[in-house]
Curated annotation (Swiss-Prot):
Keyword Transcription: no
Top-level taxon of the source organism: Bacteria
Organism: Halothermothrix orenii (strain H 168 / OCM 544 / DSM 9562)
Parts forming coiled coils: none
Name of the molecule in the record: Small ribosomal subunit protein uS13
Origin organism lineage: Bacteria, Bacillati, Bacillota, Clostridia, Halanaerobiales
Region: Disordered, residue numbers: 96-122
Amino acid sequence: MARIAGVDLPRNKRVEIGLTYIYGIGRSTSNKILKVTGIDPDTRVKDLTEAEIAKLREEVDKYQVEGDLRREIRANIKRLMDIGCYRGIRHRKNLPVRGQRTRTNARTRKGPKKTVGVRRAK
């Protein structure tokens, strides 16, 4: 079991895919890492040697991943909310931040519908 950046990589997957289980590493970053280390992307994680795993660890350590990345993202969002800019206000109100419409849709961000009752006139 290869453990890199505090994440156990799935044994039966290709290294290219296995690296994407690390938060902050996607397919393109994974391919860059493999190109630099000289490891074949089609190799299975279980077939990696200790030397190759050490190379991968060393290369992944150059990137900001897992807890550090999550912490930085959280700090950036908190900073936006503290300075009170438009994006910060949208984060605070749990609304879409990037200009999407909210008259309809935006249910993922807003949560389930809150039906407003209608008063009947007597």
